[in-house]
Amino acid sequence: MSGLKHLRNRVKSIKSTQKITKAMQLVSAAKLRRIKDRAEALDDYSSILTNIMNDVKLNINFMNLSPFEQKFFNEDIKGKPHLCVVMTSERGLCGSFNSQIIKAVKRDIVKYQEQNVKVKLIIAGKKGYDAIKSQYSDLIEEYYHITKEHYLPVALEIKNKIISLTDQDKIDSCSMYYNEFKNALVQVMTKVSIFPVETLNISEQKENSKLPDSSFEYEGSNLVSSLIDLYVIGMIKHAFLQNKAS
């Protein structure tokens, strides 16, 4: 009888665990849908800004821009360090989520150094910081802890840091590393150039543009600087949401 009672309790425990697991799956699926929807909405916004920045690059006279603004469009400006913005997670147990990014960053650091280009690092996420600091602590300009839900203040701080370093003429180019979400099982390690802005080919312009006509005059002393500000924060928020979804 004791054996039968133990078996009944065991069955009851398993059923209870199954219910809890099912509830957790439903909650996780709902969270993923929300994050995915937000990421997709921001994709459109980022695409529009990228297309406008590309249009500025192709049509504006660099001589009319400030030294700060020129760095975002003129690929010939060189001599200062390259800034790498590294997006990782706070915790482990993510498979190759962090390791792919860390390997890519370390590989690029070596490549830049071989070309006699100095490197500065901005790292978001404890796993990236822990993996990089032992070897490249002297390159780390800033490290940001990512709170569980409120990534926006961190994104704003990173944007301000990038703008500040550029305005102070401490860097002349910047790239960002993060994971692009594809589906619940697949994410792709992605490296993008924040600046100088990469020139899009015709097919990319058509794919990215949500504007009926992007040919217009850029007037006003602060218009380009304001556009740069929106563009940089848009890129960073996009990377954060893609990482979160992944």
Predicted regions located by residue number:
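C-terminal beta-strand-loop-alpha-helix "lid" module of Rossmann-like NAD(P)-dependent dehydrogenases
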Residues: 1-246
